Amino acid sequence: MATYSSDRAFTDMVHHTLAIPKIYAHLNWQPYALSVEKATEIDMFKGIDYVFTNDGFKTVQERFREKKYQQYTDFTIRYRRDQNPLIERHQSEYYKMKAAYFVYGITNCLKEDIAPCTDFIKYAVIDLKKVYEKLDDGSILIQDNGKHFCQIVDGKMVCPVKYNTDGSSSFFPIEISFLVKLWGNEMLVAQKGFLTAD
């Protein structure tokens, strides 16, 4: 299992060497410098990793995966950490995330060998505010139903709660192609590789 520090090093490397030139530059989003204190505060309490500017501020939560996850067509949001001894930490990023956008990318390398890391196999920039609107109005449902993948049921996306094998936390997937099938491109700001028409 990867350690937090190795995960952080991988994420930082991908952000600087891939995401900035291959995603944000194409969107004309410019990095906005924050003090270390402010960056730490908004990360811990609002689930915001970075802030960009382009016709106002763009707040972003990032998640990058290694190439062994390339078969997946969804992005995941951490849900709960019920095994954490601190009750105030049971609710995970789903409950605290205030970022306006979620940037999810799958790289062409492994965490253990980042030298060949030159591109994204897939990435998506998701409008999280619109996703949360669909969660709030019941158009996207999170259910602990024992399923492995999201389904479309009666015009709604039903997403299962999944559990990490080490029991540390749960998460739920959101199928990117279902967002487009149900609501067009309104939630998808940019993408590569997640839709079959690429």
Please give the residue ranges for each predicted region.
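Nucleic-acid endonuclease domains
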Residues: 1-59, 63-198
